């Protein structure tokens, strides 16, 4: 059963189409299924990371905000965060302090936004500007690639984070 939950996003399109063919099912149940499947439409950007071979993939439902990126934030559960914590005790201590693996989006609005600067810089795909990469507790590891582009002018969580930690 765990595989079903892990792979649901791989089959989102087929599952959503299938809900339309469920004859005799209450509309309320079909709507609940559509919401649970939770397909997001957007765009993926690749940010080169200084001194790393692999780029950082960022999925966003707001590609129109790409030019306003102030920081990138990654979940403590990403592969990149794992690599960084093996080399840096301060990052390791921070990641062990926060565990957002079971966090839901509804919980994010209530909790304090905390993070730690990894010291890494990503290269903006259009402007070439260097952008700091943070490990943050408000990034969902199960959404997209577990990384986000911080655009404080267009997102309240990004704004709160940048105001308290980056001092914009």
Give the positions of each predicted feature.
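Short glycine- and Lys/Arg-enriched binding-loop motifs that mark or flank ligand-binding interfaces
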Residues: 58, 64, 111, 115, ...
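Conserved small/polar residues in nucleotide/adenosyl-binding loops
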Residues: 166-168
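Conserved, charged catalytic cores of large soluble enzymes
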Residues: 1-111
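Catalytic-site beta-strand/loop segments enriched in glycine and acidic/polar residues
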Residues: 120-159
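Conserved oxyanion/phosphate-binding beta-strand-loop segments in alpha/beta enzyme cores
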Residues: 97-134
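A generic structural signal for well-ordered coil/turn residues at beta-strand boundaries
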Residues: 2, 39-41, 67-68, 116-118, ...
């Amino acid at each position: 059963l765990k595989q079903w939950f892990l792979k649901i996003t791989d089959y989102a399109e087929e599952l959503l189409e299938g809900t339309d063919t469920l004859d005799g099912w209450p509309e309320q149940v079909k709507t609940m299924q559509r919401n649970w499947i939770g397909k997001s439409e957007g765009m993926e950007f690749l940010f080169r990371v200084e001194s790393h071979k692999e780029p950082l993939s960022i999925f966003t439902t707001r590609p129109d905000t790409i030019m306003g990126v102030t920081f990138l934030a990654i979940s403590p559960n990403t592969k990149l965060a794992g690599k960084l914590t093996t080399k840096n005790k301060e990052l390791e201590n921070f990641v062990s302090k926060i565990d957002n693996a079971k966090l839901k989006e509804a919980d994010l609005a209530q909790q304090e936004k905390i993070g730690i600067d990894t010291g890494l810089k990503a290269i903006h795909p259009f402007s070439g500007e260097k952008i700091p990469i943070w490990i943050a507790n408000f990034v969902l590891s199960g959404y997209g690639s577990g990384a986000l582009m911080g655009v404080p002018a267009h997102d309240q969580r990004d704004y709160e984070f940048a105001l308290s930690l980056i001092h914009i």
